[in-house]
Structures are given as C-alpha cells and as structure tokens.
A protein has these predicted regions:
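Short alpha-helical "recognition helix" segments of helix-turn-helix
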Residues: 93-98
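N-terminal interaction/assembly modules
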Residues: 1-71, 120
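DNA major-groove recognition helices of helix-turn-helix
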Residues: 101, 105-116
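Short, well-structured alpha-helical interface segments that form or flank functional binding sites
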Residues: 5, 89, 104-107
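Solvent-exposed, non-membrane alpha-helical residues enriched in polar/charged side chains
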Residues: 66-70, 82, 106
Length: 120
C-alpha cells in the first residue's frame, strides 16, 4: 500500500458513510409515507447498523492516519496532509488558507505521501 492509498482510506470511508446516510434518509422517508412501513423496518435497521459500523471504522482509521501524520517532521507537510486527508479539503482551499500556490501544496502533499509510505 502506498502512502497515498493509506491516506485515502479515511476519505473513502467518509464517502461510504455519506452514501449510507442518504440511503437511510430516503428509506425512512418512504417508510413514513408508505402504509407498509413495517416491510422497510428491517432494511432501516440494517442501514443503521451499517452506519454505526462505518463510523466506528472511520474513527479507528482516522486515528491511525493522524498518528502517522504526526510522525512527519515538516510542520507544513503535517498541516497540509491533515487538511487534505482528514478535513477533506481541496488543494485550492488549502492553498488559499495557507497563502501558498497550488503547486506548493502539491509539492508538500507529494513529500508527505512519500514520508507516510516509509512509515507504514
């Protein structure tokens, strides 16, 4: 696993959580409007359990990633990796916040991802 793949784990789980939340919300709405809401109850319960599991997994992955990021010596790399992979900000958002060019952000991301690769 590369450093970038390791760091992307949290983003992927976050996307799964959002997807399950959307499914759960739509299923709940259908159950409210439908006279056969008991039919949907098992599916709603399954989605709630899946959401709980994903949130637990997300917390564990986030902790592992943050532990590795904290091992990097360069402060800017740490900040940029945290903003990109934990706060899930775009390169443009990070560049604006840190008063840096997008190329500078990409440079630090690449350096940080390489450093993470050596730590995993």
């Amino acid at each position: 696993m590369t450093g970038k793949e390791f760091l992307w784990q949290y983003i992927m789980i976050d996307r799964q959580i959002r997807s399950v939340k959307l499914q759960l919300d739509s299923m709940t709405e259908v159950a409210k409007e439908n006279a056969m809401s008991s039919v949907f109850q098992n599916e709603i319960t399954d989605l709630k359990n899946e959401l709980k599991n994903l949130i637990s997994e997300s917390a564990a992955v986030k902790r592992r990633i943050l532990d590795r990021i904290q091992m990097i010596e360069n402060d800017e790399c740490r900040d940029i990796l945290t903003k990109r992979y934990i706060e899930i900000k775009t390169v443009s958002q990070i560049a604006r916040e840190m008063f840096m060019s997008r190329q500078g952000v990409h440079y630090h991301l690449a350096a940080g991802e390489k450093a993470i690769s050596s730590l995993i």
